[in-house]
Amino acid sequence: MAYPMQLGFQDATSPIMEELLHFHDHTLMIVFLISSLVLYVISLMLTTKLTHTSTMDAQEVETIWTILPAIILILIALPSLRILYMMDEINNPSLTVKTMGHQWYWSYEYTDYEDLSFDSYMIPTSELKPGELRLLEVDNRVVLPMEMTIRMLISSEDVLHSWAVPSLGLKTDAIPGRLNQTTLMSARPGLYYGQCSEICGSNHSFMPIVLELVPLKYFEKWSASML
């Protein structure tokens, strides 16, 4: 859950988000080292009085600044590709949920059940109870079992939307006429909030997403009560 004046990411709840945080730290360190080197070279150029006017080329230096960036790009690309393959890999999901974006709400359908579907609208500020979050609460939460692989099928009925839950490392476009998929797995129970992340009209800011991850036995009770 985000909090005011937050500068970093939300706490990771899924293996994918943990990998993304590690990759962010890895890349940030490389950027920091490059920036330090460039700043050091610029400071030397501004402060030194030495010149070498007779030198027309330097093969050694040109070789270094050709090979070194290539090595740096490889160090960034390899872990990035690894995470991309992890995000695309979906093997034998325990549950499949179909998500449809509308102007301006979400609808969900549990495809493993015969008649389990509902719409999820934002609760207006005037109807919030004490302790509830403004612009983030919904009338129907998406209840899912924790520690299980869940496949989300995401599309749209009208315009472009984007289904995003930052703490789980999820952000998938909802495109009319196209079915995208992503996978999620939560390591612990809790409420996880997200919002539509693609400008989709006047009420774009009023399309929250709330996932409630619970142990399997509580999910079974909830699904039985909804049928």
From Swiss-Prot:
<feature type="binding site">
    <location>
        <position position="196"/>
    </location>
    <ligand>
        <name>Cu cation A2</name>
    </ligand>
</feature>
<feature type="transmembrane region" description="Helical; Name=II">
    <location>
        <begin position="60"/>
        <end position="87"/>
    </location>
</feature>
<keyword id="KW-0679">Respiratory chain</keyword>
<comment type="similarity">
    <text>Belongs to the cytochrome c oxidase subunit 2 family.</text>
</comment>
<feature type="transmembrane region" description="Helical; Name=I">
    <location>
        <begin position="15"/>
        <end position="45"/>
    </location>
</feature>
<dbReference type="InterPro" id="IPR045187">
    <property type="entry name" value="CcO_II"/>
</dbReference>
<keyword id="KW-1278">Translocase</keyword>
<dbReference type="InterPro" id="IPR034210">
    <property type="entry name" value="CcO_II_C"/>
</dbReference>
<feature type="binding site">
    <location>
        <position position="200"/>
    </location>
    <ligand>
        <name>Cu cation A1</name>
    </ligand>
</feature>
<feature type="binding site">
    <location>
        <position position="204"/>
    </location>
    <ligand>
        <name>Cu cation A2</name>
    </ligand>
</feature>
<keyword id="KW-0496">Mitochondrion</keyword>
<protein>
    <recommendedName>
        <fullName>Cytochrome c oxidase subunit 2</fullName>
        <ecNumber>7.1.1.9</ecNumber>
    </recommendedName>
</protein>
<keyword id="KW-0813">Transport</keyword>
<dbReference type="InterPro" id="IPR011759">
    <property type="entry name" value="Cyt_c_oxidase_su2_TM_dom"/>
</dbReference>
<keyword id="KW-0472">Membrane</keyword>
<dbReference type="InterPro" id="IPR002429">
    <property type="entry name" value="CcO_II-like_C"/>
</dbReference>
<feature type="topological domain" description="Mitochondrial intermembrane">
    <location>
        <begin position="88"/>
        <end position="227"/>
    </location>
</feature>
<keyword id="KW-0249">Electron transport</keyword>
<keyword id="KW-0597">Phosphoprotein</keyword>
<dbReference type="Pfam" id="PF00116">
    <property type="entry name" value="COX2"/>
</dbReference>
<dbReference type="InterPro" id="IPR001505">
    <property type="entry name" value="Copper_CuA"/>
</dbReference>
<dbReference type="GO" id="GO:0045277">
    <property type="term" value="C:respiratory chain complex IV"/>
</dbReference>
<dbReference type="GO" id="GO:0004129">
    <property type="term" value="F:cytochrome-c oxidase activity"/>
</dbReference>
<comment type="function">
    <text>Component of the cytochrome c oxidase, the last enzyme in the mitochondrial electron transport chain which drives oxidative phosphorylation. The respiratory chain contains 3 multisubunit complexes succinate dehydrogenase (complex II, CII), ubiquinol-cytochrome c oxidoreductase (cytochrome b-c1 complex, complex III, CIII) and cytochrome c oxidase (complex IV, CIV), that cooperate to transfer electrons derived from NADH and succinate to molecular oxygen, creating an electrochemical gradient over the inner membrane that drives transmembrane transport and the ATP synthase.</text>
</comment>
<dbReference type="InterPro" id="IPR036257">
    <property type="entry name" value="Cyt_c_oxidase_su2_TM_sf"/>
</dbReference>
<feature type="binding site">
    <location>
        <position position="198"/>
    </location>
    <ligand>
        <name>Mg(2+)</name>
    </ligand>
</feature>
<keyword id="KW-0186">Copper</keyword>
<keyword id="KW-0479">Metal-binding</keyword>
<dbReference type="GO" id="GO:0005507">
    <property type="term" value="F:copper ion binding"/>
</dbReference>
<dbReference type="InterPro" id="IPR008972">
    <property type="entry name" value="Cupredoxin"/>
</dbReference>
<keyword id="KW-0812">Transmembrane</keyword>
<keyword id="KW-1133">Transmembrane helix</keyword>
<feature type="binding site">
    <location>
        <position position="198"/>
    </location>
    <ligand>
        <name>Cu cation A2</name>
    </ligand>
</feature>
<keyword id="KW-0999">Mitochondrion inner membrane</keyword>
<feature type="binding site">
    <location>
        <position position="196"/>
    </location>
    <ligand>
        <name>Cu cation A1</name>
    </ligand>
</feature>
<dbReference type="GO" id="GO:0042773">
    <property type="term" value="P:ATP synthesis coupled electron transport"/>
</dbReference>
<feature type="binding site">
    <location>
        <position position="207"/>
    </location>
    <ligand>
        <name>Cu cation A1</name>
    </ligand>
</feature>
<feature type="topological domain" description="Mitochondrial matrix">
    <location>
        <begin position="46"/>
        <end position="59"/>
    </location>
</feature>
<keyword id="KW-0460">Magnesium</keyword>
<dbReference type="InterPro" id="IPR014222">
    <property type="entry name" value="Cyt_c_oxidase_su2"/>
</dbReference>
<dbReference type="Pfam" id="PF02790">
    <property type="entry name" value="COX2_TM"/>
</dbReference>
<feature type="binding site">
    <location>
        <position position="200"/>
    </location>
    <ligand>
        <name>Cu cation A2</name>
    </ligand>
</feature>
